[in-house]
């Protein structure tokens, strides 16, 4: 029986920073946010912090976002491992070309026991949920039947790995958009902010918006100043969105 799966977003990597011993400079931050500040101060040789209004790391980072000097954010990056995301949502995700992606392969991984993501509008209605899951079970049956028939058709191929790959790459054509995928996503902080501005918006698809808000929560833990301007709100339907006064590039 087809099983639904919940969204899981984990931050698995984030930029670290080792200040050069040759530069007389210190900061009250560390890691990615310290790196961004260092890059900015390197542009103007302001390691002595001549402006008291931007002497702290938080004040400095807020200033660069206020004036739009967000190219500095490209020096820091974060990597997420996302599971419990539908294949259709990953199609939206991979449109963000400044990210780097490594996605679960349907050619090499058997999808006969696939888990699925149920759209909330369907999931909240017992009758629609039942209909949806029956459709997924029927789809899985067809996929497995096709896969078995294709492997028999290719039995003359001596390479077992190639035989399975060829069968799966043909059978996957019937897999639904709701099929769970798993994907590793790496992006610099500027790219993550652009993604959040577009996909955490109330106008975005519900699933990709949930992914964006989950990513935001992880990013805030690592870089609270860089991402702290995004405010999460709960909409009338119970879903969440996030907005920032600094995000205008859509």
From Swiss-Prot:
Its cofactor is FAD. Its EC number is 2.1.1.148. Residues 7-233 form the ThyX domain. GO terms for molecular function: flavin adenine dinucleotide binding; NADPH binding; thymidylate synthase (FAD) activity; thymidylate synthase activity. DUMP binds at residues 92-95, 103-107, 172, 199. A motif (ThyX motif) lies at residues 95-105. It is an enzyme of class 2 (transferase). HAMAP family: ThyX. Homotetramer. Belongs to the thymidylate synthase ThyX family. PANTHER family: FLAVIN-DEPENDENT THYMIDYLATE SYNTHASE. Catalyzes the reductive methylation of 2'-deoxyuridine-5'-monophosphate (dUMP) to 2'-deoxythymidine-5'-monophosphate (dTMP) while utilizing 5,10-methylenetetrahydrofolate (mTHF) as the methyl donor, and NADPH and FADH(2) as the reductant. This is Flavin-dependent thymidylate synthase. The gene is thyX.
């Amino acid at each position: 029986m087809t099983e639904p799966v919940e969204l899981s977003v984990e931050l698995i990597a984030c930029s670290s920073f080792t200040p050069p011993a040759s530069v007389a400079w210190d900061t009250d931050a560390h890691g990615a946010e310290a790196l961004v500040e260092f890059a900015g101060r390197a542009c103007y040789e302001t390691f002595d912090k001549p402006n008291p209004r931007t002497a702290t790391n938080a004040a400095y980072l807020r200033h660069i976002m206020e004036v739009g000097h967000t190219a500095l954010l490209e020096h820091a990056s974060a990597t997420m491992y996302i599971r419990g995301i539908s294949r259709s949502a990953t199609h939206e995700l991979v449109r963000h070309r400044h990210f780097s992606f490594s996605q679960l392969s349907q050619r090499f991984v058997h999808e006969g026991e696939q888990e699925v993501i149920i759209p909330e509008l369907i999931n909240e209605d017992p009758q629609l949920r039942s209909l949806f899951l029956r459709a997924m079970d029927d789809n899985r049956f067809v996929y497995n039947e096709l896969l078995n028939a294709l492997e028999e058709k290719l039995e003359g191929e001596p390479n077992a790995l190639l035989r399975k790959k060829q069968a799966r790459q043909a059978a996957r054509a019937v897999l639904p958009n709701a099929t769970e995928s798993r994907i590793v996503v790496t992006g610099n902080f500027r790219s993550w902010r652009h993604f959040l501005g577009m996909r955490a918006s109330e106008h975005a698809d519900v699933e990709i918006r949930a992914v964006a808000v989950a990513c935001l929560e992880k990013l805030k833990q690592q870089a609270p100043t860089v991402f702290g301007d995004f405010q999460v709100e709960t909409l009338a339907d119970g879903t969440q969105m996030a907005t920032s006064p600094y995000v205008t590039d859509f």
